[in-house]
Amino acid sequence: MTVTYEVPLSYTINVSLSALPQGLAEFNTNSIAIFSNEPAGFSDSYRAYLTPSSVATDFGSNSLTYKMANALFKPVPNFRTGGGNLYIFPFDGTNATAGNFTTIDLKESNITAFQSLENGSLSITIDGKTSVVSGLNFTSVKTLEDIANVIRSKNLDVNISVDSNKIVFTSRSAGASSSVEINTISKADLIDISSSTYLDASNGIATAGTDAKGTTLADAVAQAIQQVYFGGVLTTQVVGDDTRLANATAIQPLDCVYYDSLQSLNAISKIGADIKSAGLGKTRTLAYSKDNHKVAIATYASVASSVNYSGSNTANTMNLKTLTGILGDSGLNDTYLLSAQSNGVDIYANTGGISVVYSNDNNGYTDDINNQLWLKKALEVAGFNYLRQTNTKIPQTEEGMTGLKNAYAQVCEQAIRNGVVGAGTWNGSIPFGDAEKFTEAIEQKGYYIYSIPIAQQPQTEREQRKAPVVQIALKFSGAIHFSDVIVTIQR
């Protein structure tokens, strides 16, 4: 057989196959990390969880870690709706303790004396703030628990419990500044229940609170976020106000949101005010005076992290949201309500038979802070992937800049779809770009993107292969929280 030479097809047509480089996946700002100072059933630095039952296996079903994790999965929607994962990081920070005042053993004679008292008074100093309550009617009491209930009815910012034959008054704050004292009332027209006939407070014992020790939450978060990304931070640790403020300050520069609870309602005007005045908007506080305040803030964080930013009209507000499984705070009053509003602390109250969150402005509302975090991470990924996903290069030309700005514009369009951004009117002076185009873009779309022409870029920046700075103006759609209605009627 004669073999005839054939010229290979590749001599004429040479085909090479290449794939575009893989880009970064989007950061999931709805993922939540619990930093647990309870014993863990594993030695890893952290574990990921898709169900609360696995948390019970590792920490025990009676642990606070499990109760907080379980609370994350309860609301509908919750952080999983937003695609979030749960990570739990063990760390060795100890709990701060609360100050308390414990009476001596009270006898039957003390209870008998209370039974004849219709208008008793009590002066108590809690964390340095003195309150005097009167009108304490003990005529129906039979036990120390009954006596405690009468005092509880005055809604003092203190936990009152019975331990054998003693009544214990425990501060709802913790740390070295946490304290409780029972005072003597000097007014002759008031019947002082601190006297030896009743509580015999002069022989009671006041114990000051102590600060947390060991690894701080701030240090634990800084180390953990290098291992896996999460957008929300919770902790089982109990801390004092100084440590809480230090944690908030350290977490503020990080790309995450710190959710914390305040059991003391008086803390609204103290640490709540400090956090707001320091500009620490990434710390979101919920004042809730019940013992399960840590579970309440976990439920709150889950609802706040439930936005699926890939969806349509999915953006939310925490205002008037119900926290599944959490009762409204019966310790609230008008003073605390107004204090929470002015100091940017959220509360959970009863209105018309339902329990809802009242969300307040701490350098932005909770949804503002979460939306800003998502927006930042989405823009980072969009810009990186545009530069990354080419087998050649993005030229330093107007064409290259148009492509880069288009990548950022896709995030802005997504923000319109999910309801974070909306068309509106820009209030104030035009900050950059062409004033007419700026105004038109904000009114028609809700965002405006601008960069100076390549020809105007400083040569030093061009030599460093930097793009001209891209400036983006966004009009957040906000949320309606209040409404005034005026009705004019003619007869």
Identify the meaning behind each predicted range.
Residues 1-60, 64, 79-80, 358-491:
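Structured, hydrophobic secondary-structure cores that serve as assembly/anchoring elements
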Residues 1-31, 38-41, 46-121, 126-132, ...:
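Polar low-complexity, Ser/Thr/Gly/Ala/Asp/Asn-rich disordered segments used for subunit assembly
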Residues 63, 198, 216, 324, ...:
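Helix N-terminus capping/helix-initiation residues
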Residues 153, 163, 222-392, 404, ...:
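A glycine- and small-residue-enriched flexible loop/hinge signal that marks low-structured segments
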Residues 157-159, 346, 471:
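Short, surface-exposed charged micro-motifs
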Residues 178, 185-187, 304-305, 426, ...:
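Generic alpha-helical propensity signal that fires on short helical segments
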